[in-house]
Amino acid sequence: MSEIEPSLLLSHARTIARDNDISCWALPTGELLVPHAAGGSTFIFVDQLEEPVLHLHTSPRGGVDLSEISELAYLANEWNHDCISPVVVVDYDQPDCVSVSGHSYLPADTSPSREQLAAFLLPALRNAEVLMDLLAQSHPGLVREASPELAPLADAPLEPFTLDSLAGLLPLIGIQ
């Protein structure tokens, strides 16, 4: 890739995911969403505030009680693999207020080649899947079943896309 274009970078990321049998959805805003079998999802986007950076943000669907924070902190500190850094997240406004999210990023100011992008993306997505599996085993409340409200959405006619509609859909797929 010679020039940095977020849409091109994300298009290559989506192609790499699909070529490796990883389910990857393009959102109307251009970002990508990778669902995980154990629950949760990885949101892929390009941040261009300063230098362009490809971000992967992985989060489970649910949360657990504050009493489990020390176990989750231990898990996040012990399980810190290549390409993903889990952190404990506390949202005091929610009844199940403790969750874990994972972050991976690739500085893209040097226009990574497809091979470099694949070398970053594939391990990051594999580790995100492993993290979701681990959370499902150790803290099942973090990876709840998808909301039953998603089923009618699958067959619903497409409505005009707005930021408000995206904000309403993201919690249904596990992004807080």
Regions found by a protein language model. Name each.
Residues 3, 7, 66, 111-118:
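Ordered, soluble secondary-structure elements with a strong preference for glycine-centered loop motifs
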Residues 94-122, 133-143:
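Well-ordered alpha/beta subsegment
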Residues 38-70:
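Long, continuous compositionally biased terminal/linker segments
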Residues 25-29, 48-50, 90-98:
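Short, ordered beta-strand-loop transition motifs
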